[in-house]
Amino acid sequence: ALWRIVSQQCLPNQQAHDNPAPCTQVDVPAGFVVFKDRNGPLQYLLMPSAKITGIESPAVLDATTPNFFAQAWRARHVMAERYGKPIDDGDISLAINSEYGRTQNQLHIHISCLLPAVKQRLAQIGPDFIDQWQPLPGGLLGHDYLGRRVTPAELEQQGAFRLLASGLPRAERRMGSFGLAMTALPDGDFL
């Protein structure tokens, strides 16, 4: 359904009428669209303007593929525009489901707000994270996670997908097994 919306509505409307509807934003040169998710008042999806199934696609590791996580971070302003006032970066999360945890076969990154309990927990443990993948102490909401600190330069230059693939043993061959999430830390880095 998502790919049909992108390919049959958003892209044609942008190209023919300079109107991204039903998407919020279409950036053909940069290779992405932003679409209002039907769930939640401030939840959006950033999707490629090309057909890419998900995190398991080899395309996400190709250096010529747009850096979708960096683009999603830059697109976070759509939430504040809809809300009518600024939203603190520490309240925003980006997330992509694993191949097995999603219902759509078009790569999409969720742009939404963190649950307050998650924000509080990450604030407690965030300062302890380094630039290597490590387990989140005690997990989060009953699940085990790995985390690492990412600088803005790393996000822009390498992107979240390549950082995952190069940072964990055998991850490159098992990308579909992973979900990824990202939020800002108070010092400007990401977790």
What are these regions (language model features)?
Residues 1-191:
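HIT superfamily nucleotide-processing domains
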